[in-house]
């Protein structure tokens, strides 16, 4: 496996990561007791295989159904936990709800510290405002950093390039998860700006949806 420096996080991240969106029995937030041994064994077998081939970065999200709870149980049962664990939490107008969501994810993943914590889906100006306002989501995450509960702070986005540039220019983030593909390079300027700020750049779903077909206009 090849690795790259992930911007100012200074983490060495593999060029291929293990996405956890499909590590789930359901999109609903089920109790672990509702997940069969067969379903859980699939997750743990994949984690062991990923470890064998050097995929040391695993990412998931609050919105990925049972993914966090299944990964958390998997981390307890496999031989080696991935070096880099990332989860993503949606922005919220109420910082205390956002903090509660972060703490719930840490509990589900059964780890002492989340290496990469992304604000999930900064797709509108309102989302960005909730993230960066005084006393907002970023301030919550800074306090959790001081408690060593999270590492680097990033954001994921399906938003327009102009919005992503605005978020990067706040200089509040260490990395960004965004779309960029061989046949759709609208975010090239965004990536150049991210490089200027030394942000890590993570490409979202490079082989899913319509991204390997002709360009289609998105609406947000």
Protein language model features and the residues they cover:
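Helix C-cap/helix->beta junction micro-motif
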Residues: 53, 81, 147-148, 197
